[in-house]
């Protein structure tokens, strides 16, 4: 066991334009090869497209999409007596948001379309409405957890 103290949680910084932590989390997840300015560009273009499509506050659409995709429970593989069980575990809010962002970006990358900003904006609008690939992924995870409810005591 380590004698060091526990590391304190780092608070996520907010982005320069919208002053929003969720936007910054999105930027950091979309980032590839250290090109942060390109990541910001993609996110801001996607937010503008959301504004044009919905004619509402794009940050509220973003919040609604992430809230809709955030899972409450997930399954974790746990080895017990030679066999591996999928054990349902509860997920904290920060980890849930991170998963939701990962699923949203994965679903938007798989979408057909012109560019990433267009695909991301479409996925976010769909997720806010309650449809789309990321929402399906969340429902799939919840079904998996419900199916393996019998193994919850292995936690």
From Swiss-Prot:
Its main location: plastid. Keywords: Chloroplast, Plastid, Ribonucleoprotein, Ribosomal protein, RNA-binding, rRNA-binding. It is found in: Plastid, Chloroplast. It comes from the Eukaryota. PROSITE patterns: RIBOSOMAL_S7. GO terms for molecular function: rRNA binding; structural constituent of ribosome. One of its GO terms (biological process) is translation. InterPro entries: Ribosomal_uS7 (IPR000235), Ribosomal_uS7_bac/org-type (IPR005717), Ribosomal_uS7_CS (IPR020606), Ribosomal_uS7_dom (IPR023798), Ribosomal_uS7_dom_sf (IPR036823). CDD domains: uS7_Chloroplast. GO terms for cellular component: chloroplast; small ribosomal subunit. Disulfide bonds: none annotated. Pfam families: Ribosomal_S7. Belongs to the universal ribosomal protein uS7 family. Part of the 30S ribosomal subunit. One of the primary rRNA binding proteins, it binds directly to 16S rRNA where it nucleates assembly of the head domain of the 30S subunit. This is Small ribosomal subunit protein uS7c. It comes from Spathiphyllum wallisii (Peace lily).
């Amino acid at each position: 066991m380590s004698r060091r103290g526990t590391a304190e949680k780092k608070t996520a910084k907010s982005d320069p334009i919208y002053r929003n932590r969720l936007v910054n989390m999105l930027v950091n997840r979309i980032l590839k090869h250290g090109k942060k300015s390109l990541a910001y560009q993609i996110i801001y273009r996607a937010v503008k497209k959301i504004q044009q499509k919905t004619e509402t506050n794009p940050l509220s659409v973003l919040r609604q999409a992430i809230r809709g995709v955030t899972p409450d429970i997930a399954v974790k593989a746990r080895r017990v007596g030679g066999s591996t069980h999928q054990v349902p575990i509860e997920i904290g809010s920060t980890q849930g948001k991170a998963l939701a962002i990962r699923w949203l970006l994965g679903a938007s990358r798989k979408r057909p379309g012109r560019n990433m900003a267009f695909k991301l904006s479409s996925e976010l609008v769909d997720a806010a409405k309650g449809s789309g690939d990321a929402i399906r992924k969340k429902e799939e995870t919840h079904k998996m957890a419900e199916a393996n409810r019998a193994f919850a005591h292995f936690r």
